[in-house]
């Protein structure tokens, strides 16, 4: 028997299921519920899988496999499913462990695991008798957790170090630091400060942990299945956090954050009662500030921004405008002449800092505008202009199609012209292609059959001599097309 615990309180009991002929995976089934279950809990197997960091990180998946904790039974044995997000954990009925012995907040981390998770190098000889948060955290970037003597901005002695992408220029730590400067202005009471540091000779962003034994974190993905952005806003409005949610949207709009999925924002709650106490601070900003845009691309930044879109909403500028209110208006106003404290280095050069400042200032002015704007209106994009022209041509062609369809329905042509509703005609194809209105060919093919379908492409005079009835149709269509030019 196994017990799902919240600190030292049993909230559920479950047991291993008998093996099946078609699965080697050890599964569990619930036996009893005796307390409040974690947010988003559906069944014990899904909950265990959601605790594993390996679902996001291929390197940690390999590490966990070598440690024997990649399956649910091994994961319980090694980690007890403890995380730094809440105070839930698991023990077997053969163990006399207490929360005080398991808590990641109270006990030291395994340096070997921490370093392996952060550096991604081969296994070192080490003691895996204790564990570390790396095995049960979310996110695809290499990160590690360290306990330090001096506590941070949230009063915790636990700090998170997160690296950049090994396959790219590695600008993400800089971007996270810069975006947190914007967050400090827009959401001064509800953001996570980041700074850049070197750890084991690797650049990383560093922040303080905002959870503790009293207050846990639940991502929005565990709270509800929203069908629209309005559903998300309504949720935060119900818990009294609509202003905090607006602030997050504006920060993401100004910083062009592409990664605000439902796992990257959520709520804080009381670990004992599971009562929601407010919105979690704004965090996870490493995909803000255009980390994958080259310096050359800044010359045509509108084309790059045309390729991007936020996760919440469909346009960076528009969603920022929609989130604005009087309080945010005053804060965004200060961004119009904003400069970063960080002025650049060899990796993130000063000219890139200046380029980002220019973009953010222009975006701030757009958010303050009374005119409804989208990103393409603020940052000119030739690609967007070409796309808009194309869409305009399509709309005009569709309009011509409907005008033509109505006109054909009203034509009074000889009975020898129409014989079927579903047979095609080379002559009709010729009439259309001759005038460049291919969009309506299929319509007419379905509509009529020319009496002499053997006719090939001919001149109008030859058509009149060979098939007067067909020419009558051609003449009326040609006149219709000529009149369509005004549309």
Feature locations, PLM:
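Phosphate/dinucleotide-binding and metal-coordinating scaffold of catalytic cores
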Residues: 1-250, 254-256, 268-393, 400-402, ...
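Intrinsically disordered, low-complexity regulatory segments enriched in Ser/Thr/Pro
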Residues: 24-31, 37-38, 435-472, 479, ...
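Conserved protein-kinase catalytic-loop segment immediately C-terminal to the catalytic Asp
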Residues: 261, 266-268
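Low-complexity, intrinsically disordered short peptide segments enriched in small/polar/basic residues
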Residues: 332, 391, 395, 405, ...
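Intrinsic disorder/low-complexity segments
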Residues: 385, 397-398, 406-408, 452, ...
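Amphipathic, interaction-prone secondary-structure segments
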Residues: 406-447
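Function-determining sites in protein domains
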Residues: 408-409, 414, 418-421, 459-470, ...
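Cys-based phosphatases of the PTP/DUSP/CDC25 superfamily and their flanking regulatory architecture
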Residues: 486-487
């Amino acid at each position: 028997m196994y017990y799902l615990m919240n600190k030292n309180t049993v909230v559920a009991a479950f047991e291993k299921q008998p093996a099946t002929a078609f699965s080697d995976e050890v599964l569990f089934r619930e036996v009893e519920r005796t307390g409040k279950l974690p947010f988003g809990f559906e069944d014990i197997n899904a909950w265990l899988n959601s605790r594993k960091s390996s679902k996001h990180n291929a390197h940690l998946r390999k590490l966990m496999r070598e440690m024997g904790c990649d399956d649910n039974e091994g994961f319980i044995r090694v980690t007890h499913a403890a995380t730094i997000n809440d105070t839930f954990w698991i023990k077997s009925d053969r163990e006399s462990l207490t929360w005080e012995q398991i808590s990641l907040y109270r006990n030291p981390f395994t340096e070997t695991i921490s370093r392996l998770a952060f550096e991604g190098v081969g296994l070192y000889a080490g003691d895996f008798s204790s564990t570390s948060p790396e095995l049960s955290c979310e996110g695809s970037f290499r990160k590690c957790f360290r306990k330090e003597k001096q506590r941070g901005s949230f009063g915790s002695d636990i700090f998170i170090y997160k690296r950049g992408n090994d396959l790219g220029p590695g600008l993400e730590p800089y971007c996270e630091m810069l975006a947190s400067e914007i967050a400090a202005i827009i959401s001064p009471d509800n953001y996570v400060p980041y700074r850049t540091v070197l750890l084991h000779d690797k650049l990383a962003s560093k922040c303080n942990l905002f959870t503790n034994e009293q207050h846990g974190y639940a991502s929005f993905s565990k709270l509800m299945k929203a069908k629209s952005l309005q559903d998300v806003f309504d949720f935060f409005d119900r818990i009294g956090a609509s202003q905090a949610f607006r602030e997050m949207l504006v920060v993401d709009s100004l910083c062009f954050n592409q990664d605000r999925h439902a796992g990257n924002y959520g709520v804080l709650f009381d670990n004992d009662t599971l009562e929601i106490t407010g919105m979690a601070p704004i965090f996870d900003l490493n995909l803000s500030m255009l980390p994958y845009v080259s310096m050359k691309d800044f010359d045509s930044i509108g084309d790059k921004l045309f390729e991007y879109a936020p996760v919440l909403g469909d346009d960076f500028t528009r969603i920022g405008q929609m989130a604005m209110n009087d309080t945010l208006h005053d804060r965004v106003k200060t961004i119009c002449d904003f400069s970063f404290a960080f002025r650049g280095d060899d990796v993130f050069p000063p000219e890139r800092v200046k380029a980002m400042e220019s973009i953010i200032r222009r975006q701030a002015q757009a958010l303050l505008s009374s005119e409804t704007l989208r990103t393409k209106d603020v940052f000119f994009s030739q690609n967007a202009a070409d796309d808009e022209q194309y869409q305009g041509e399509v709309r005009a062609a569709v309009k011509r199609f409907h005008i033509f369809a109505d006109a054909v329905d009203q034509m009074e042509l000889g009975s020898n012209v129409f014989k079927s509703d579903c047979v095609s005609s080379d002559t009709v194809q010729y009439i259309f292609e001759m005038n460049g209105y291919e969009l309506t060919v299929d319509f007419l093919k379905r509509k009529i059959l020319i009496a002499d379908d053997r006719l090939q492409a001919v001149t109008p005079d030859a058509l009149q001599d060979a098939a007067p009835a067909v020419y009558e149709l051609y003449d009326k269509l040609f006149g219709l097309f000529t009149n369509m030019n005004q549309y």
